[in-house]
Amino acid sequence: VVGGDECNINEHPFLV
């Protein structure tokens, strides 16, 4: 899931 900083940053902090 690509959202940015309001997606799953805690699980996959790549699109922060």
Swiss-Prot record:
Compartmental location: Secreted
Main location: secreted
Stated role: Snake venom serine protease homolog that may act in the hemostasis system of the prey.
Biological process (GO), any one: proteolysis
Family of this protein: Belongs to the peptidase S1 family. Snake venom subfamily.
EC number from the UniProt entry: 3.4.21.-
GO molecular function: serine-type peptidase activity; toxin activity
Top-rank lineage group of the source organism: Eukaryota
GO cellular component terms, semicolon-separated: extracellular region
Protein's name in the database: Vipera russelli proteinase RVV-V homolog 4
Transmembrane helix recorded as keyword: no
The keyword Nucleotide-binding appears for this protein: no
Keywords: Disulfide bond, Hemostasis impairing toxin, Hydrolase, Protease, Secreted, Serine protease, Toxin
Tissue spec. comment: Expressed by the venom gland.
